Amino acid sequence: MTEKKYIVALDQGTTSSRAVVMDHDANIVSVSQREFEQIYPKPGWVEHDPMEIWASQSSTLVEVLAKADISSDQIAAIGITNQRETAIVWERETGKPIYNAIVWQCRRTADICEQLKRDGLEDYIRDNTGLVVDPYFSGTKVKWILDHVEGSRERAKRGELLFGTVDTWLIWKMTQGRVHVTDYTNASRTMLFNIHDLDWDDKMLDVLDIPRAMLPQVRKSSEVYGQTNIGGKGGTRIPIAGIAGDQQAALFGQLCVKEGMAKNTYGTGCFMLMNTGEKAVKSENGLLITIACGPSGEVNYALEGAVFMAGASIQWLRDEMKLISDAFDSEYFATKVKDTNGVYVVPAFTGLGAPYWDPYARGAIFGLTRGVNSNHIIRATLESIAYQTRDVLEAMQADSGIRLHALRVDGGAVANNFLMQFQSDILGTRVERPEVREVTALGAAYLAGLAVGYWQNLDELQEKAVIEREFRPGIETTERNYRYSGWKKAVKRAMAWEEHDK
């Protein structure tokens, strides 16, 4: 029998699909990536073609094995991680989508959400699903599809249509329609799932008029769901054995599996998650309660805060303001000045996320004086990412009663040493940057590997979690608090800007 040397992680993201092969030491052996089209039918609407998601993801799987000259019988298992909340509805019989995937960023269901608020459902939704009423989550997207595609609700009631988030869609396709499942982490992002009963919530299904017959079975994040023979020479069937939504996969990939451990992912936005163990901590501070993975993929809970503009604000400096020609230049220019000269940039281009949740806030620059130059604005924009992270962390510590001792970080912007040092300074806590930056794929690989015995337990994985660099606070508490109070003042003035116009 051929030795099972490798694990494959499929990382289906918002703009691209990736496949990553890892060996037993969690080293990356091979990577393949394909971008796909973003569809914008109207302002604020975002769609993907589900068939293109599938084509891009399946081709990266074939490609990544061919590239490394690996046959499918050398693969122990496949793990899947995915963009969360994005909703797909397809025909059970043909596997054909009845509409494009409605992407997590899409705001078309704002009216449905406003109606839910008018109907007094906010508290019920928060208490039972852990989420706020927002177009972000899948439930209102599914309702929209059933409302707008003729005859679809009746077909769904007859069991002819299926719903899934991206993980469910991929597994359905990989198993030729034999397996219709999701995991607890993805289910917890739909606004249809009761995170305490660990089952679909009948009241939410009733309110949104979504037939239970179309919903997938919900399973643990680490177990064998089915097998696929796609991707390899020799047609060996490979177990699909791990699923987690991208942020929960990153939390697991950073091995934040104990209560009080937290990670922040610095991508287009920031996503901070803190594991709260077996208890769902109620948030009084505008955070989401979501399901995360415990040490063997079982249900744990987490607090989650999303910042909308992190890397996106650096792109703004590059693309719209033309202050830098490359995102990497931001560190160089930020360190050419000793501080921001009193400037604060609030990058509320699309409103503010956690803990403010103000869709009417708008971007602003405060504290401008004659001596301010472009380097001060670049530095202040970078600092805004760290301030927003502190906003979320303060809310987490208040809700959980846990004082964070170290923050694990990942994502594109963590390569910026200035930002990471300032993050440590403004939090007053250690910031740990791992050697392997592909933590989302790593999380999916770990979940799959643990399910099939490729790795025995987490102790075996702890040795592989090497911290490449640790940043420690370098400023005094008084200085830290003074700077942060300036940020709070700036945010307050940027809030509710749009409402004044109306």
From Swiss-Prot:
PANTHER family assigned: GLYCEROL KINASE (PTHR10196:SF69), SUGAR KINASE (PTHR10196)
Native source organism of the sequence: Salmonella typhimurium (strain LT2 / SGSC1412 / ATCC 700720)
Encoding gene (name): glpK
Keywords: Allosteric enzyme, ATP-binding, Glycerol metabolism, Kinase, Metal-binding, Nucleotide-binding, Transferase, Zinc
Residues the entry annotates as binding ADP: T14, R18, T268, G311, G412, N416
Single GO BP term: glycerol-3-phosphate metabolic process
Activity: how regulated: Activity of this regulatory enzyme is affected by several metabolites. Allosterically and non-competitively inhibited by fructose 1,6-bisphosphate (FBP) and unphosphorylated phosphocarrier protein EIIA-Glc (III-Glc), an integral component of the bacterial phosphotransferase (PTS) system.
Enzymatic reactions: glycerol + ATP = sn-glycerol 3-phosphate + ADP + H(+)
Record EC number: 2.7.1.30
Pathway the protein acts in: Polyol metabolism; glycerol degradation via glycerol kinase pathway; sn-glycerol 3-phosphate from glycerol: step 1/1
EC category: transferase
Alphabetized InterPro entries for the sequence: ATPase_NBD, Carb_kinase_FGGY, Carb_kinase_FGGY_CS, FGGY_C, FGGY_N, Glycerol_kin
The protein's assembly and partners: Homotetramer and homodimer (in equilibrium). Heterodimer with EIIA-Glc. Binds 1 zinc ion per glycerol kinase EIIA-Glc dimer. The zinc ion is important for dimerization.
Cystine pairs: none
Pfam family, one: FGGY_N
Similarity annotation: Belongs to the FGGY kinase family.
Domain of life: Bacteria
Name of the protein: Glycerol kinase
Cellular component GO terms held in the UniProt record: cytosol
Protein's job: Key enzyme in the regulation of glycerol uptake and metabolism. Catalyzes the phosphorylation of glycerol to yield sn-glycerol 3-phosphate.
Chain sites annotated for binding glycerol: R84, E85, Y136, D246, Q247
